[in-house]
């Protein structure tokens, strides 16, 4: 016979939300760090498509 589940306490729900939010903040921080590295030219450990320069576009 089916039995209703127990309600999750607010403390547990808030703790799970805080963990989720912390992970999201960490990912955002990492993305900003990579973005800053690309813009400053200090990138060494990853690849990304480079935009064509004006000289290359003029030759075509």
Curated annotation (Swiss-Prot):
The keyword Ribonucleoprotein applies. GO terms for biological process: translation. Keywords: Ribonucleoprotein, Ribosomal protein. One of its GO terms (molecular function) is structural constituent of ribosome. One of its GO terms (cellular component) is large ribosomal subunit. The keyword Ribonucleoprotein applies. InterPro entries: Ribosomal_bL32. Belongs to the bacterial ribosomal protein bL32 family. This is Large ribosomal subunit protein bL32. It comes from Synechococcus sp. (strain JA-3-3Ab).
């Amino acid at each position: 016979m089916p039995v209703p589940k127990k309600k999750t306490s607010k403390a547990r729900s808030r703790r799970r939300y805080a963990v989720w939010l912390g992970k999201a903040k960490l990912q955002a921080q990492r993305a900003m760090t990579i973005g800053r590295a690309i813009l400053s030219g200090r990138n060494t450990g990853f690849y990304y498509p480079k935009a064509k320069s004006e000289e290359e576009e003029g030759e075509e």
